[in-house]
Amino acid sequence: MELNDANLQTLTEFLRKTLDPDPTVRRPAEKFLESVEGNQNYPLLLLTLLEKSQDNVIRVCAAVTFKNYIKRNWRIVEDEPNKISDPDRTAVKANIVNLMLSSPEQIQKQLSDAISIIGREDFPQKWPDLLTEMVARFRSGDFHIINGVLRTAHSLFKRYRHEFKSNELWSEIKLVLDTFALPLTELFKATIELCQTHATDVNALKVLFSSLTLIAKLFYSLNFQDLPEFFEDNMETWMTNFHGLLTLDNKLLQTDDEEEAGLLELLKSQICDNAALYAQKYDEEFQPYLPRFVTAIWNLLVSTGQEVKYDLLVSNAIQFLASVCERPHYKHLFEDQNTLTSICEKVIVPNMEFRSADEEAFEDNSEEYIRRDLEGSDIDTRRRAACDLVRGLCKFFEGPVTAIFSGYVNSMLSEYAKNPRENWKHKDAAIYLVTSLASKAQTQKHGITQANELVNLTEFFVNHILPDLKSPNVNEFPVLKADAIKYVMIFRSQLPKEQLLQAVPLLITHLQAESTVEHTYAAHALERLFTMRGPNNATLITAAEMAPFTEQLLNNLFKALAFPGSAENEYIMKAIMRSFSLLQESIVPYIPTLIGQLTHKLLQVSKNPSKPHFNHYLFESLCLSVRITCKANPTTVSSFEEALFPVFTEILQNDVQEFLPYVFQVMSLLLEIHSNSIPASYMALFPHLLQPVLWERTGNIPPLVRLLQAYLEKGGETIARSAADKIPGLLGVFQKLIASKANDHQGFYLLNSIIEHMPPESLTQYRKQIFILLFQRLQSSKTTKFIKSFLVFVNLYCVKYGAIALQEIFDSIQPKMFGMVLEKIVIPEVQKVSGPVEKKICAVGITKVLTECPAMMDTEYTKLWTPLLQALIGLFELPEDDSIPDDEHFIDIEDTPGYQTAFSQLAFAGKKEHDPIGDAVGNPKILLAQSLHKLSTACPGRVPSMLSTSLNAEALQFLQGYLQAATVQLV
């Protein structure tokens, strides 16, 4: 694509169409942009547009498109073509910093993100001048430019907060500190001075305080891994100024907005974080500054209002106290009973109150409320911080703290009892306090795993939780009902089973509550209870115990999906999945009705997939319906196909990328249930599964391979007979997969199925080429994973076609190649093979080579006979060799910044491990003994003499054991 006006005009038109709300206009435009993004100059055209377009909407759209393009394509993935040409990469890096700094803020943010994505891959090795170019801009004096640099540096360095320690990381941070720490400190001091100079200029202060907040964030990132020497030497400068900013109160920066945090709050919040970091990690060095920070933060807490805009500040300030009170160093600051009472009264109790803003969120923004309350994204909430402070104080002062709080809990509950309708918030706070007091350790999987023994959880449940759950009107006091459900959920591991069983029917009833939070919590609580393990590793609650409630449970769960706002509620769908899994065959009578509801739901969500978790659990539930019903009666598979295929066809035709991996897995499950034949409906689809475009998406590969394996297993003969022209396409897929280090094992899965299930004559013309391709890959990049898969394939080929055929095909490629493969690959590497089925295949294959291949007994290959036998005995007896060569590159596809739909494995579409040898060989050691016996009777004297001259004593001893077990001997 040339950099010319015509192309800029075309790009402008298509970008405008991507903003169209009409999908018939928007989708073709998105497809067009996708089709041209591989062309050279495409990123430069976007950068030109965002710089020069007259239309601001197009500029912003170009910036967002550019950022997403970089996110998808910048990383160079091994084995895949470079998606951005080298000249484009160089040009982007040469221009982007300048462009970002001269752009308006809306565009600056997008380009700043793009720089950090590029930096994640290229900095520092491939972009060594990035930092010096950025630091040079500090001298510009223009705070629009300076803030652009700071914002970019923040997005570049914030990963230091969660990276694992490594030499590479240390050297990168050292480089950053050497270049950046001093200019940042100078900028910090200069900005503080400018704040004093412009103390009465509100516009200047807004810009300067934005800078200070970014500087404080950078301080946190650069100090997170370890205390750098530079910052230790300059601690006085940083801490004195941080303390000054913490105690600053500039009326000009106060906002009237009750919701949105202002610049002053954001800066103070970050300073609290920085102080907490130093108090936790560098307490010795920070000790001289700690008392004044404790005083400043305490004063801040007791003087800050209850408005939402202060939430982040208050929660960070409380988190600071929580991190301080947990350290033995600072224990003395909290020992006094009056101090504990004061903290409880002035900090903890006020911040546990359920405010009108919380009530609003509960009713009108339930999704966000649930996300915060259930999923632990409540890190920045006052309640969560107050809860953490209670836990921190209990570490050293459990007795006194429990006594103080028990008094508060009792008085709150008695206030509630006087007038429940008016005072229900008192009970809410009491439940929250009890929860914080009682929780010592918690996990997602088990809820509270360690509780404060001074709190009687069962008594509290019976007296204060059960009455709310039993109340006949599920829509009355929804917040207290949600609290009660949550109590059951988080203390499930602490409450006795009989109380959990008492709660189950009550929770089922609460699925009918109109409140989204309430019916979501009920679904989540049931799902968690159904996963609890009892004795013997079985589920704690059994299908038999659920029998009286099964119908109501299923009805209420599906009805709950009809509530406004819960049409794609992931908690309800997960509870449906878990109920199916627990109830097993008890659900069969209901499936004819439920499958219709599930497929209807699938059709709806496939129009615009937006809730990945919901969609995943929906497909899991479909798999369970199929597995459970067909286990009882395999012929019902056709009724599932009738229900599902119309929806699947629509998903395939509309190329709903997110759903294709799921559809392929469910189809595999259905096809695997058929007895040995392929229905015509599947054969019609077969050619489409070989289309290269499907195989370009990483997420499709594992499920597509499994689906093709199912085709081969059920209809290798049919494919050879009626679709022989598709065999080259099938082998083309194998060829593509084998060339990739990330997917070569999938190529072998496919190849092994082809060898196992296709009639031998249908492959005659292709066999030699298959081996040549494998050797080419061995020469170009030999990884441990590839060799293990190669060994399994070679031995499977031997089992299927015989040892002579294996030797002949190797030697037809190149004379004496069979010996080279044995000597260089099989003998030294076979011990790396892992997995019982894989080891069995190798053992049977090698046994055949040893005992059924004449060339091993009377040619130059004979010298390899004993080493090969020794290697086989090693495979049986030695521990698996899991060593990996030092220089081997690990393919990391987990954190690709621009990943395609990752493969989502459906747990309930699980495939049984297939053993191609099956019962034909029970014990490979016995097979070896019997085969050696047979060989020795055919050529008497040869085998014992080869063993006695060159097999080591330990291996010989093991072999004697096999012969005895098989009751045979060598002659």
Curated annotation (Swiss-Prot):
Coiled coil: none
Keyword annotations of the record: Cytoplasm, Nucleus, Protein transport, Transport
Residue ranges constituting the Importin N-terminal domain according to the UniProt record: 29-102
InterPro entries linked to this entry: ARM-like (IPR011989), ARM-type_fold (IPR016024), Importin-beta_N (IPR001494), XPO2_C (IPR005043), XPO2_central (IPR013713)
Primary location: cytoplasm
Entry keyword Translocase: no
SMART domains from the UniProt entry: IBN_N
Gene Ontology cellular component terms for the protein in this record: cytosol; nuclear envelope
Subcellular location: Cytoplasm; Nucleus
Superkingdom assignment: Eukaryota
GO BP terms in the entry: protein export from nucleus; protein import into nucleus
MF terms (GO), sorted A to Z: nuclear export signal receptor activity; small GTPase binding
Keyword Transport attached: yes
Main function: Export receptor for importin alpha. Mediates importin-alpha re-export from the nucleus to the cytoplasm after import substrates have been released into the nucleoplasm. Negatively regulates fluid secretion and plays a role in fluid homeostasis by down-regulating cftr activity.
Subunit relationships: Interacts with cftr.
Family the UniProt entry places it in: Belongs to the XPO2/CSE1 family.
The protein, known as: Exportin-2
